[in-house]
Amino acid sequence: FRFGYKAVDQADWNIVAAHAEDAAQQAMTGRTLNVTTTIETSGNYGSNTSSATSLGGDFLNNGTADGSGSGYVLKKALQAAGIAINKGTWGTVKPKDLVCRAAPDLADPISRSKEIHAYLKESPFALAQVRGDVESQNGLWGLPDSLYGFKWVIEDAVYNSKKKGDTASLGYVASSNVLPILARPGKLVGVVGAPSFSSVHVWVYEEMTVENKDDVDNRRHSGRVVDDYGQDLVASAASYLITLALHT
């Protein structure tokens, strides 16, 4: 970002700091987009990827309430993925270590399925969830924080895929038709040299550095955000990607 002295002097607010915050937010959204692309690329998972119909017998939003018809599709798919991960890690990674990451427009149709309605209706915690007595980060999207022993996280980051000056095209960073199941044991920051079963690692060289330059010769202020990192899905055995998740 760049502003002339006149614009900065006449602004009623700290215009340089405000745009530095905007640039940092864009960099954070960019990081989310890059990590999301990595975890939604089926080639990163080896043999640990399959369609919803192959795992559960139907699309994830077609589960029934009593096991008839398609049956408990979501449960069957999650259990099949969990078993594959558990076997592939020699029993090390269990469902309690796994996180299902879903986009809002994947969580919504799943939450409206008969299978999920029955699951919540028969849960002893259902009334507390409905009344709001128990905080839920997924409540807006209709899914509990834990489902069939798997934790759920809804990725609701939004980005504009068009360039500046074009008509905005807003969408979720996360895809609505895939469900990555990722291992997230232990703490956020790992220990160098120690074994890790965490699915995704972000290698950071320089993190979110905001730089400002007072360009006296051109009578302007210039700024930028430096975020130097790379991301990899390093533990494919501890991860699973369910594709073609929804019946659209």
Give the residues covered by each predicted segment.
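Short hydrophobic beta-strand segments
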Residues: 99-103, 180-181
